[in-house]
Amino acid sequence: MDPSKGFEYVAGDYYQTSGVAPPTSNGAGSNVSPYFPYHAYPTSSTNGATGGSMYGTPQQTSAYAMYPPGPGSSPEEAFPEHTTTKIVEGCEAKYNVKGKKMRKPRTIYNSSQLQMLQKKFQKTQYLALPDRAALAHELGLSQTQVKIWFQNRRSKQKKQKGGSSDHASDEEDDDTEESKPESPPMGESVMIQESSEPRTLVSSSIKTEMKEEYPPMTLNEQYASPYLYGSDFSTILPPSQGFPNNALYNTAGAYPSIDYTNGVYQNTLYKYV
C-alpha cells in the first residue's frame, strides 16, 4: 500500500467526519497531513522541479484559521452555557465563567424611601419577614434591599454609639486630670515639709525633756561638782565664794574667769595652777 494514499484516505476521512472543507492545493502539489496541519511550501530541487515539504512558513496561514470564530468576542458570549443566572428573592445574581458572583450596581434610594425606612427603623431595628415584605412592596423595593439597608443602619448606629462613649470617657479623664493638683517631685515635697515645720517647737521640746531628766542644781551642787559642766555651763559666782579672782575650776586646763572690780564683771582667761 502506498503511504501517500493512506495519508490521503485518513485526511479525507478526517475532513468528512469533521465537516470542514479541506484546504485547496496551491498548484505546486502540496499536501496536508492530519498530523502536521500546515501547508507545504514549494521547494526547488536540483533538477528544477518543485517538491513538497511538511513544514510550513510563518507567513502562510495555519490550519487553525479554517475554523470560524465564535459568535462573540467575550467568553460569556462565546460560551453562554457557562454563565448562570440565580434569582434570589426577586433579584437576579449573575456569575461569571470562574464562578464568582458579579457585583451589582449600588442601590440609590430616593428621599421618600429613605424617610419611610428611617421612620420604620425608629420603631424597630429588626423586621420580621411579613413586615419586611410589606415594607418592600410599599416602597417598591426588593426584600433584599430593605434587609441590607437595615443591616447598614444598625452597624452605623453601633459605630456612632461607640464613638460617643469613647469621646465621653476622654472628657471625663480630662476633667479628673484638671481637678487633681499638681504634686511636686519627691525632693521638693520633703524640703517643703521641713521648711514648714517650726524649728522653735523642736528646740522647746528638747529643753523640756532635758529639764525633766536633769532638774536644776543648787549653787552648792554646782560648786561641789564643777567637772560635770564645761565652760559653756559655767555659772557666775559672787565674789564672796573665796576663789582666786572669782574663777571657776575647769578640768580642761583652760577656763574662763570673771573678775569683779568696782561692781563690774570682767571676763579673763587664765590657767589655774
From Swiss-Prot:
Localization (cell): Nucleus
Keyword Nucleus: yes
DNA-binding region, residue range(s): 102-161
GO molecular function: cis-regulatory region sequence-specific DNA binding; DNA-binding transcription factor activity; DNA-binding transcription factor activity, RNA polymerase II-specific; RNA polymerase II cis-regulatory region sequence-specific DNA binding
Tissue-specific expression: Predominantly expressed in the head hypdodermis, neuronal support cells and CAN neurons.
Record's GO cellular component terms: nucleus
Chief location of this protein within or outside the cell: nucleus
One of the GO BP terms on file: embryo development ending in birth or egg hatching
Keyword set, alphabetical order: DNA-binding, Homeobox, Nucleus
Region of interest (Disordered), residue spans: 47-79, 153-204
Nucleus among keywords: yes
Function of the molecule: Probable transcription factor. Binds to the sequence motif 5'-ATAAT-3' in regulatory elements. Required for development of the anterior hypodermis during embryonic morphogenesis for cell adhesion; also affects embryonic and larval viability. Modulates and maintains dopaminergic neuron differentiation. May activate dopamine pathway genes in concert with ETS domain-containing protein ast-1, and homeobox proteins ceh-40 and ceh-20.
Homology family: Belongs to the distal-less homeobox family.
PANTHER family given in the database record: HOMEOBOX PROTEIN, HOMEOTIC PROTEIN DISTAL-LESS-RELATED
Protein name per Swiss-Prot or TrEMBL: Homeobox protein ceh-43
